[in-house]
Amino acid sequence: MIKHKGKIISLDPTRHYSSSSNSIAFLSHAHTDHIFYPSSYTGKVLASEETVRIAYARGYRYSNVMSTSEASSEGLEMIDSGHVLGSKALLIDGKILYTGDVCTRDRAFLKGARLPRCDIMIVESTYGMKGFRFPSIDDVVHKANMLISDLYAKGLPVILMGYPFGKAQILTNLFKHWAPIYIHEQVLKINRIYEELGVDLGVHDAIAYTHAKENGMLDKKPWVMIAPKQSNDTIFIRYMKKHYNAVTVAFTGWAVAKMRMHMHMYMKHDYTLPLSDHCDFIDLVNLVRSCNPSKVYTFHGFADEFASYLKSIGYDAEPIHALSDDVNKNEKLLYYI
C-alpha cells in the first residue's frame, strides 16, 4: 500500500485493503487474483474502463470509480502495462511506479508496455529468475501453425488453450485463419466484450462449443477450438479426447520451466508452447534499466531471486513478501510483509 496526500492507495487488493473513505483501490487489470468483491468497501476505485467492464462481467461490480481527471488531480497516472486488455501500471506523482502484471512484448493486437523513468519502482517478478527466456512470438506462432498443419493432415482436431481472459483472445486473433474454428463459451463471453470495446479479434459470427457439439459439427474433423487452459485429466478434455480424439496445445510461459517444482504446470497437455502475457527474466531486467529507479521492490513469483540479481548489478532492491498484519513503513511506501 502507498500513503499519498493523506490517502491510502491499495495496489491490486484481493482481501487485505483499506476500507476507509480516504482510501483508493487501484486495480491494474481484471484477472481475479487482482480484484476484490467490493461489498464492504467505502473508498474509491481506480481502474481503466476496460478493467471495470470486464470485472463487471465476471461478477465484480464497482461503484465510485475515479475519472481520469480526478485521478490526475491526485497525482495518479495510469499507463498501459501490456499484460491484457485494459491493464495499467500506476505512476504516483511522477516518482513511484507500480507495474502490476507487465509485458513489454507486442502480441497480436496488444502493444507491449513502455514505462517511464521513476524514483521508486514496484515491479512484478513472476518470471524473475535466470532461465526464463521466451522465444519471439513469431517463432511460437510458426511452431503452432506447423503443429496444427501436421495434425490436420492426420484428421485430428486441435484445442488451443489459454487463460479465458487475456491469453485466449490473443489466441483467437493469432489463429483466426484456421477453419472451422469454434470458441468455448467461457472464452466467447470475453471475446464479445473485447469486440464491444472496439477490439476486432478477426473471428466474426463465432460458433460456440455447445452449439457445434449439439449440431454435430464436431464430428466433422479436423477443426480448431479456442478453450480455457486445463489439464488433460479434466472432465471436458477427457470427453473431447474420447469422442473426437482431440489434441491439446497449451500456451504458457511455464513451458520453458526446467525446475521440477513447476513441471506439473505444463506436463498435463499434449503440447505446451511458451507464450506469456508477462515479461521474461531478460525483459524484466531491461524494464528496470529503462525505468532507472533508485529503489526497486520486487513482488510475486521469484521476488527474492530477482531482487538478489538486481542487487548484484548495482540496484538497491528488496522483495515484498506475502500479506500479513505487520506493516513496515518507508517514507513513501507502506507494504505488508
Predicted regions and their residues:
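His/Asp/Glu-rich metal-coordinating catalytic cores
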Residues: 1-24, 30-159, 166, 173
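Active-site regions of enzymes building and remodeling cell-envelope glycoconjugates
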Residues: 21-29, 40-49, 59-78, 118-121, ...
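Binuclear metal-ion centers of metallo-dependent hydrolases, dominated by the metallo-beta-lactamase
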Residues: 1, 115, 129-208, 212-217, ...
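C-terminal regulatory/interaction regions
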Residues: 212-337
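Conserved residues at the C-terminal ends of beta-strands
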Residues: 28, 48, 124, 184, ...
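Structural beta-sheet core signal
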Residues: 97-98, 160, 183, 225, ...
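Short acidic low-complexity segments
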Residues: 8-19, 68-73, 203-221, 235-239
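Active-site-proximal loop/helix segment associated with metal-binding centers of metalloenzymes
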Residues: 84-92, 102, 106-107, 118-126, ...
